[in-house]
């Protein structure tokens, strides 16, 4: 039945999600990297999401169990990814960074799973890595995914910080010489598109609207 299927699914998340092996993810443009920290966050938030589903269904003991597992996974994540003033792209890769956009769900669900102000630390670090036309996806290349920038920006503590991420993105859309419908994959230094155009992922641009609706 559905419950058994979900239990098996989240059992796999707990077993393999903390420190992912060489798995596919949406940020593989520069190649596959095992131990992907953002992919690990996705698994952790999945476990937390299962806890929330159980809570809504009145399965309080199940909710508490999986909430505790997610909390412990998040604490371990913080230790594994810690690079001092930011967190790594992959657990075993020193001097790397990446957008941890999957962490937006921790903020939106008001769970506070990740300790030591992880979100605020990451957001502050990202602001030091921005180029003329936006924040790169990670430390490997200068290109970005603008839908993920919008998710990342939605983690900002206030509107002023949010706008610091949005202004370069607006500049890209307004000034790019690539005459295609909005591309969600572009170079942050030149403002030219890499690929993709007019895709449904542009819906991710409305993450701030969703976050405000859920939190207010």
Locations of the language-model features?
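Terminal, non-catalytic domain-edge segments
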Residues: 168, 183-184, 188-216
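Structural helix-adjacent loops and short alpha-helical linkers that scaffold large soluble proteins
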Residues: 1-7, 51-71, 109-124, 156-167, ...
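Extended ligand-binding clefts on enzyme/binding-domain cores
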Residues: 36-41, 72-165, 171, 175-180, ...
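Aromatic-lined, polymer-binding surfaces characteristic
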Residues: 2-57, 63-66, 74, 80-84, ...
């Amino acid at each position: 039945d559905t419950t058994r299927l979900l239990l098996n699914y989240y059992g796999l998340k707990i077993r393999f999600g903390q420190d992912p092996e060489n798995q596919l993810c949406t940020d593989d443009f520069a190649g596959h990297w095992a131990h992907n920290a953002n992919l690990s966050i996705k698994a952790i938030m999945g476990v937390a999401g299962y806890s929330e589903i159980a809570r809504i269904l009145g399965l309080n003991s199940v909710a508490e169990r999986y909430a505790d597992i997610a909390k412990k996974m998040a604490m371990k994540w913080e230790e594994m990814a810690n690079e001092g003033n930011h967190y790594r792209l992959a657990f075993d890769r020193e001097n790397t960074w990446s957008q941890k956009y999957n962490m937006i769900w921790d903020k939106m669900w008001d769970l506070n799973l990740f300790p030591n102000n992880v979100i605020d630390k990451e957001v502050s670090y990202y602001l030091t890595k921005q180029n003329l036309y936006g924040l790169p996806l990670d430390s490997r290349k200068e290109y970005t995914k603008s839908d993920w920038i919008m998710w990342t920006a939605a983690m900002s503590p206030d509107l002023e910080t949010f706008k610091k991420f949005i202004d370069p993105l607006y500049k890209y859309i307004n000034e790019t010489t690539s005459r295609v419908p909005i591309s969600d994959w572009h170079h942050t230094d030149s403002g030219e598109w890499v690929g993709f155009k007019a895709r449904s992922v542009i819906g991710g641009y409305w993450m701030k609207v969703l976050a405000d609706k859920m939190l207010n």
